[in-house]
Amino acid sequence: VLIIAVLFLTACQLTTAETYPRGQQRHHALRSTDKNSKLTRGCTPRNGFCRYHSDCCSNFCHTWAIMCL
């Protein structure tokens, strides 16, 4: 069963490689890192309101004071 699964996945990759030449694939996988998402949505500056570490530009939210450090 494992061999069949590996062969199937290899065939899918080869088919995709033949269908879409390098750099011309229509639907790229969405890869969003925390840094990239901050560029699009902005981040909370120091002493601003936060709930999570990822809300802050510094990546540190003081949870009981509810502000970015």
From Swiss-Prot:
Top-level taxon: Eukaryota
Removed propeptide positions: 18-40
GO cellular component: extracellular region
UniProt keyword annotation of Signal present: yes
Subcellular location: Secreted
Chief site of localization: secreted
Tissues of expression: Expressed by the venom duct.
Disulfide cysteine pairs (residue numbers): 43-57, 50-61, 56-68
GO MF terms held by the record: ion channel inhibitor activity; toxin activity
Segment forming the signal sequence: 1-17
Keywords for this protein: Disulfide bond, Knottin, Secreted, Signal, Toxin
Family of this protein: Belongs to the conotoxin O1 superfamily.
Domain comment quoted from the record: The presence of a 'disulfide through disulfide knot' structurally defines this protein as a knottin.
Protein name: Conotoxin LvVIC
